[in-house]
Amino acid sequence: MKKKILLLGSGELGKEFIIAAQRLGQYVIAVDFYDGAPAMQVAHEKEIINMLDGNLLDQVVKKHKPDLIVPEIEAIRTERFYEYEKQGYQIVPSAKAANFTMNRKSIRDLAAKDLKLLTAKYLYASSEKELAKATKILGFPCVVKPLMSSSGKGQSIIKSPKDISKAWEASQTKGRTSATEIIVEEFISFKSEITLLTVTQKNGKTLFCPPIGHRQERGDYQESWQPAEISEVQLKEAQRMAEAVTKELTGFGIWGVEFFLTEDQVYFSELSPRPHDTGMVTLSGTQNFNEFELHIRAILGIPIPEVTQERKGASAVILASTDGKIPEVRGLDIASEMPESDFRIFGKPITRPYRRMGIALSYSTKGEGISSLRKRAILLASKIKVD
């Protein structure tokens, strides 16, 4: 069952996915806009193109004729996926899923209006004037997001009328496309946020991984831990929502479904139809299969009977602090002295401030608490420098 996989996007998540795929004997071509991307370092072949150029994307698909097309990022001309499906290519998880989830308007309307899932109240705005009007309706604080962006790019919190102009400017210059429309959300005063990794299978039931807690800064993940603290009632509701939305989007693979938790409510936030950055905590052995192993098994149609929690774990990001090329890694000897810990250096060839260059991992088989594991992962990350 050797398949040819075209991986669109070659970051750290793609690198771990390729490693998992190769362990099952698969052949992978890694694609990205720059040479030397992490996943290219472990792929059988590579292609360097602008994936937002549909014609270039067509050429790569025609050249390689893959059995599976697996998106790893959102900055892709995903509209082409519908045509690829008509031509007989398998899109992971599906063309519909890839297109809906890259656009916050599509996925939010699907969740809130079609599936009636609980979400933050929201409005759309296509001008600074409309944004100001939306803030009057939703109140302060509120959250502004481009319809298409990732890792917090272009997002901001409006706390008062004086923030409106700056928030509008950020949404227009830091998003992923030239589209002017944005989404404006009420600010949910949540006690925590979780990622529920959800696995849809071709010939098996939908599975849920133990919930993952995470902390964000600048709109990007800084640390995650598993399992997250959540009541049984809220967990069941999150699982119900995750199953509903993934079933509607169709397809097989792993999904990172994000929720806000208040004292008594579960709010659907958004989802990614692929391995999730917060899910890298599973590399610390928290589950019988990590998220990348689950993804490749699901898309190949290999049955996954169950997902079991094996131990507790935590992750913390290792960030660059300067601009540079061919970075030097320091501190691995010191970091390696910590017990029940591990790390991954992604191999990115270029640094810039706050760019994620690796992760630190901690785990426990002796009943150690999550708080202690988080502290150890953060301490470990601080010992490693990639600049």
UniProtKB/Swiss-Prot annotation:
One Gene Ontology cellular component annotation held by this UniProt entry: cytosol
The protein's annotated pathway: Purine metabolism; IMP biosynthesis via de novo pathway; N(2)-formyl-N(1)-(5-phospho-D-ribosyl)glycinamide from N(1)-(5-phospho-D-ribosyl)glycinamide (formate route): step 1/1
Keyword terms, alphabetized: ATP-binding, Ligase, Magnesium, Metal-binding, Nucleotide-binding, Purine biosynthesis
Residues covered by the ATP-grasp domain: 109-300
Superkingdom of source: Bacteria
UniProt: Mg(2+) binding residues: 258, 270
GO molecular function: ATP binding; magnesium ion binding; phosphoribosylglycinamide formyltransferase 2 activity; phosphoribosylglycinamide formyltransferase activity
Catalytic activity: N(1)-(5-phospho-beta-D-ribosyl)glycinamide + formate + ATP = N(2)-formyl-N(1)-(5-phospho-beta-D-ribosyl)glycinamide + ADP + phosphate + H(+)
Leading EC class: ligase
Pfam families listed in its UniProt record: ATP-grasp, PurT_C, RS_preATP-grasp-like
EC code: 6.3.1.21
An example Gene Ontology biological process: 'de novo' IMP biosynthetic process
Protein's job: Involved in the de novo purine biosynthesis. Catalyzes the transfer of formate to 5-phospho-ribosyl-glycinamide (GAR), producing 5-phospho-ribosyl-N-formylglycinamide (FGAR). Formate is provided by PurU via hydrolysis of 10-formyl-tetrahydrofolate.
Assigned protein family: Belongs to the PurK/PurT family.
Name of the protein described by the UniProt record: Formate-dependent phosphoribosylglycinamide formyltransferase
